[in-house]
């Protein structure tokens, strides 16, 4: 997992509420455990028509949105069934962060554990971002994870919440297992100093 510090990129707005994980990545793509190639399935039913041809009316197929790295999505993004393939598909497509007024909890957890930053903002900021994109699809914003702020084109900084442990992992590019392995020396020292009479689950 790559460390995340500051993300500066163009936004693309998908102002649809209750986008579920099946809309993000159809179930037929869940048969694979390899992350490569999942970008093809991202928003498949919207990006392609019945013949598999790109839908020119869908926002991600517009020439001016190519290369955007920050998705601005409607409330309750990622609802529905839990599927880790959803953040994998978003990352594979090139998105580094998703901004929304509210995320489904399971999706948010899956995304953060896979290095996809989820940024929850108030409704006013969300609407402003959508309007900015409608006016200029090349709009760029900056997300500073350390400061927990989104800086808009007018210079206004908007705070977003994130728990300290997740923030630490993202800043250092480690997942939960990586964090645990980094603390191996401290764990060994604790176990060595632990009184033998204390109950343990370790095998004798």
From Swiss-Prot:
Catalytic activity annotation: (2R,3S)-3-isopropylmalate = (2S)-2-isopropylmalate
GO molecular function: 3-isopropylmalate dehydratase activity
Keywords: Amino-acid biosynthesis, Branched-chain amino acid biosynthesis, Leucine biosynthesis, Lyase
Pfam family, one: Aconitase_C
Gene3D superfamilies: Aconitase, domain 4
GO biological-process terms attached to the record: L-leucine biosynthetic process
Family: Belongs to the LeuD family. LeuD type 1 subfamily.
Function: Catalyzes the isomerization between 2-isopropylmalate and 3-isopropylmalate, via the formation of 2-isopropylmaleate.
Subunit architecture: Heterodimer of LeuC and LeuD.
HAMAP family (UniProt xref): LeuD_type1
Protein name: 3-isopropylmalate dehydratase small subunit
Species of the source: Roseiflexus sp. (strain RS-1)
């Amino acid at each position: 997992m790559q460390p995340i510090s500051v993300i500066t990129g163009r936004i693309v707005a998908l102002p649809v509420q209750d986008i579920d994980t099946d809309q993000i990545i159809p179930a037929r793509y869940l048969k694979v455990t390899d992350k490569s190639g999942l970008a093809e399935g991202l928003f498949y039913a919207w990006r392609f028509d019945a013949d598999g041809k790109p839908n020119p009316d869908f926002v991600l197929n517009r020439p001016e949105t190519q290369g955007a790295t920050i998705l601005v999505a409607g409330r309750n993004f990622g609802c529905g069934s839990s599927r880790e393939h959803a953040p994998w598909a978003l990352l594979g497509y090139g998105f580094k962060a998703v901004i929304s007024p509210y995320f489904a909890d399971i999706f948010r957890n899956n995304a953060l554990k896979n290095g996809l930053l989820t940024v929850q903002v108030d409704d006013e900021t969300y609407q402003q971002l959508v309007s900015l994109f409608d006016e200029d699809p090349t709009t760029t914003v900056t997300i500073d994870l350390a400061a927990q702020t989104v800086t808009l084109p007018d210079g206004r900084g908007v705070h977003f919440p994130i728990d300290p442990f997740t923030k630490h992992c993202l800043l250092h590019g480690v997942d939960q297992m990586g964090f645990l392995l980094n603390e191996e020396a401290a764990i060994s020292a604790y176990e060595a100093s632990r009184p033998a009479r204390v109950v343990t689950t370790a095998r004798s």
